[in-house]
């Protein structure tokens, strides 16, 4: 069963090259399971034990199941994750011709990818394209996935870059521009990409107004290791937590509390967008749920005091070759269960109270749990947990499954950890 779930995850990752595609795939899955889509512009009429979801910007989503109990007294049980991953974004008017022969695309870095992992790999291209419409305030938005190996970022030969293995510094503007094609007389000069998009979308190139396009690794993820105990794939951070949370939401029985799965966008660039964790998106939706159930704002505020959030973003496992980069005592590893993330700086929301909650959940689910802290002389990252807490004053724990090579084009985790994470999430939604 563990490998079945792992292969489901790999398929989801492959079919979700961008946040737009991840939300579309989650949306399709939820609708198949009987969840009803709500529009922010509509008035909501919700039913007890009803199943619903709402999207934002095509790249963020909140799904929920209304609980059996009084929402003011039972509150919300929330799992939060994010849909975006670090990489590159194509700039406007991106075509650059070199030596009157090569056509490459101008890019900017999105988030904090490990740049050298993107070299010499066949890359595909996906994202969202905005087309002209009759209403200027509402362009037609279409997602596109050019699932072909059309791009590559070639390395410079070692004969011309002798220091490449000695810590060569990669220039983000010069060194990371992907090669698209050779100059072709049949394509309109300077509009190679627009021509390609028009063909993919079966539209006129004049109708294309703008786009958000991201290169991604063409090769699909896989199970690997002597016993296929590992998962190797791009975008484990953080779509594996999206997959785990959505599956738990669908599988868990209806509880007294209202179960919520929130998938934010733009975590990798600070979350400060309308669809990110540093917005009122989640707070607004939670309040609307309470109001749509016939309660008032006082009941909403009461519900928050009875709520709990699991901020699910991946954790660093001890590296087999560089174990000294971790704390000398607290050392999470692959295959030994999900990880509670702790920081005195409050870059994670976990405290003794919230950590104990998740530990008891894991104990009830029969799941081993680990802990992570940074070395005291190394600064770590943060995630949506502390950002969301500034908008929603509810108890929260930061956790995630352990992986290696975080922010590489191809990350590396354990089959068992993902399975155990789903078990813990299902138990959380059940209680």
Predicted regions and their residues:
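N-terminal hydrophobic/helix-forming segments and targeting peptides
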Residues: 1-431
């Amino acid at each position: 069963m563990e490998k079945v779930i792992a292969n489901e995850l790999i398929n989801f990752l492959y079919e979700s090259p961008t946040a737009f595609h991840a939300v579309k795939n989650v949306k399709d899955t939820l609708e198949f399971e009987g969840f009803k889509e709500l529009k922010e512009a509509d008035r909501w009429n919700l039913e007890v034990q009803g199943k619903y979801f709402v999207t934002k910007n095509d790249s963020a989503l909140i799904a929920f199941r209304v609980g059996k109990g009084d929402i003011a007294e039972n509150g919300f049980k929330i799992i939060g994750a994010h849909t975006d991953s670090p990489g590159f974004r194509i700039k406007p008017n991106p075509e650059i011709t070199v030596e009157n022969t090569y056509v490459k695309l101008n890019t900017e870095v999105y988030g904090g990818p490990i740049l050298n992992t993107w070299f010499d790999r066949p890359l595909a291209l996906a994202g969202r394209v905005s087309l002209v419409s009759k209403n200027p305030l509402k362009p037609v938005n279409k997602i596109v996935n050019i699932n072909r190996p059309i791009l590559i970022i070639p390395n410079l030969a070692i004969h011309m870059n002798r220091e490449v293995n000695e810590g060569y510094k990669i220039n983000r503007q010069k060194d990371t521009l992907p090669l698209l094609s050779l100059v072709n007389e049949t394509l309109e000069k300077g509009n190679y990409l627009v021509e390609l998009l028009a063909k993919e979308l079966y539209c006129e190139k004049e109708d294309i107004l703008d786009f958000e396009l991201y290169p991604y690794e063409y090769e699909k993820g896989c199970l690997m290791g002597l016993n296929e105990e590992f998962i190797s794939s791009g975008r484990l951070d953080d779509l594996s937590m999206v997959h785990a949370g959505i599956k738990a939401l669908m599988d868990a029985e209806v509880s007294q509390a209202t179960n919520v799965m929130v998938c934010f966008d733009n975590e990798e660039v600070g979350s400060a967008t309308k669809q990110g964790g540093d917005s009122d998106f989640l707070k607004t939706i939670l309040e609307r749920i309470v109001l749509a159930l016939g309660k008032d704002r006082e009941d909403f505020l009461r519900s928050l005091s009875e709520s709990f959030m699991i901020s699910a973003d991946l954790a660093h496992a001890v590296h087999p070759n560089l174990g000294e980069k971790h704390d000398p005592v607290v050392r999470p590893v692959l295959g030994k269960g999900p990880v509670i993330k702790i920081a005195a700086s409050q870059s994670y929301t976990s405290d003794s109270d919230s950590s104990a909650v998740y530990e008891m959940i894991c104990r009830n689910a029969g799941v081993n749990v680990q802990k992570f802290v940074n070395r005291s002389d190394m600064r770590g990252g943060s995630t949506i947990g502390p950002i969301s807490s500034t908008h929603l004053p509810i108890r929260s724990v930061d956790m995630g499954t352990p992986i290696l090579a975080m922010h590489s084009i191809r990350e590396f985790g354990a089959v068992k950890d993902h399975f155990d994470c789903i078990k813990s999430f299902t138990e959380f939604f059940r209680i």
